[in-house]
């Protein structure tokens, strides 16, 4: 695909009709990692697990050539950065194994063995089970998690009824078996990053990913995906504050600022209330738009 998009004749035709930019969607490696095998993307490559170009689309060299070809016709290539979550790649698997500070990369919590009875059984061959409403309430009451979020995106009875899932027992690098509960705003194969961990590992990962797209691949603009879901906070009663949170605003400003400093621009699609969209647009992404897409939601 990338090779075809970098064709000079194609760009001559695009230039003739006034095309100044091409947004090709996420092309970096996505999906998961189980055992010694990669697993497919569960959400159209919006579950990134690395900065390498997925061979299904081509090579890094072909992406770079696409940018150069676009520039030759006074146009730019736009890429994506996904600040709120990853796929279940090596980083998540290291977090499950309690390796160094990797658990801090994700919004995940270890459940004490005496409370494993609150967790659902994980089917053989699966790597997680979605929590039911009563389990979320029980874990919230014990102080493990912040509780139900304001809404359940991708809600599907029997598949995703809450935004929390539990792992089976996982053997850690220290020889201890643990079960974790982790947050996922979207599908359970898209664990949410923790933007409030003292390690600031999530910020380092996402900023590094953005700069890789700009400085290595040659993208001149980045779409910020689901950047309105970076902060979540328990309110003591009722549902947790998970949309329009100040941390999302600050995180958006940080990421957009780094992108501008690197000489590029950013744009965002926000599936939020109008007031939250206005707040997120202050000092953050340079452009905003709304475009409904199947299974992902828009405005």
Summary of predicted features, one role per range:
Residues 58, 206-208:
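Outer-membrane beta-barrel transmembrane strands
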